[in-house]
Amino acid sequence: GLGDVYKRQSIDNVIINDIFFYDEGFKRNSNEVRTPNGNGSYGWGIRILNLSDSGNLENLTIKNSIIENISHSGIRVKGRLDNKFKNVNIFNNKLFKTGGPGMVFNSTYNLHAYANDINFSGSPDDSRKWGRGSGLWTWGSTLGLIEKNKFQNANGPADSAGCHIDFNCKDIVVQHNLSKNNAGGFVEILGNNYNCSYRYNVSINDGYRIKGKGNNFQEGKSFWLSGFVGNGNERHGPYNSYVYNNTIYVNEDVVSKIAVDKNSKGVLVANNIFYYKGETAMVLGDQYKPDTGGDGSIENVFFENNLFLKDHWPKEVLIQPSKSVIGDPFFKNAGGELISDYFPLNIDLIKDKGIDITNIVNDSIGLRIGLKVDMDILGNPIKNMPDLGAIEIN
């Protein structure tokens, strides 16, 4: 009934495929993919939303399921911003060729999304599909742990990162994931987000999209802090973003683009390996209300102790590295498909060369889950000082 709280819903071991609203051959208007979520009718995989004024769901689990060939989102969970779904556990699911995002978590509190395999989100292989979508994204959510997932081959003219943190979130941690070949990019944190983090992930060839090519209206970006908080609203944030111990590899035929909004406040970037073989470029954030650029200085920045293949972080970006290490980590198999291909063989350059991560200046919170990490992306214990990148040399 109205105002009731329903506890413990579980979806387990379900197979969902070929879900379309229209018959084969239906073609969507080319502007449809430019709207924030699509305005037309679609088939969805699992869609859970709160249409009540005061009712709610708690302890929601979706696990061990396969969702394939859907015209929009694979899994979309949508609570209310003022009455969030509580305790959402999504694990061990396989999502393949969804026309929209793989998973969307809107207005959740205490989300754990782990060990999911999301491939070809935003798939354009059927004209009935939306053709845009990140592997996973959150909006209006607080306390989220997104870990041990694979985000691969996200496609679309905008967004379509491996995993992005949309606006109005707090305490979302993205860790121990593989992010590979996603058009939109790797790190994407939007506005009005507080204390969010990407740590101990491996990113391979993310952010290759070129604005203006085909239908693309956003640049792909390797690293993007965006103050966007919705159409027509004044940009602000993100606040206190922690990006550390990631291994980021981009091959020579991709320009690695970086966008940092001047409204960002509090940024920590440390212990990462930025292996950009090709060119790099500063670009402006390009959502529906674009970043106007211009001078600005971002307060409370700690951008130190990162390894770069070359000294080519773009000079126009409003955050600039210091105390960097320049060198080649000698990955076991640079350009490979697997996390283990990015095991660094240059031990002297990497081992115990990380620094302990501490709170950003004027941030009393850090990360609620804790800044210290016990294991690397492969499950190796972190001993002594942390190493550089996502893989600990034991």
Where are these regions (language model features)?
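Glycine- and acidic/polar-rich repeat regions and solenoidal domains
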Residues: 4-11, 22-59, 68, 72-88, ...
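C-terminal accessory segments
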Residues: 322-393
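Activation loop
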Residues: 2-3, 346
